[in-house]
């Protein structure tokens, strides 16, 4: 059963998207993760160091892992960095009612 979630991915003090190409890659990686997990995006907002998303999915963990891995791999290669971009545990709230 698909549930709706508010997801917040925080990068702490790191800037998630430094230029327009980063934003485009982020949105494309999000679209691919949504398509792969048969989810639907209801709303999103990309801030300088964190991202908010409202998503309806039955495969929440897979969606978040796929999205974080794809974008972090791109970001690390582009900016010659290593390690996680986002904090280990995303903020997730089930939206019901």
What feature does the model see in each segment?
Residues 1-97:
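Short catalytic/metal-binding and nucleic-acid-binding patches
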């Amino acid at each position: 059963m698909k549930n709706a979630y508010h997801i917040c991915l925080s990068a702490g003090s790191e800037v998630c998207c430094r230029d327009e190409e980063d934003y485009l890659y982020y949105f494309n990686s999000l679209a691919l993760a949504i398509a792969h997990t048969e989810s639907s995006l209801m709303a999103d907002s990309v801030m300088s160091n964190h991202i908010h998303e409202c998503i309806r999915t039955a495969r929440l963990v897979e969606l978040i892992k796929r999205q974080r891995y794809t974008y972090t791999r791109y970001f690390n290669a582009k900016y010659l960095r290593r390690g996680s971009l986002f904090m280990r545990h995303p903020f997730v709230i089930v939206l019901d009612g």
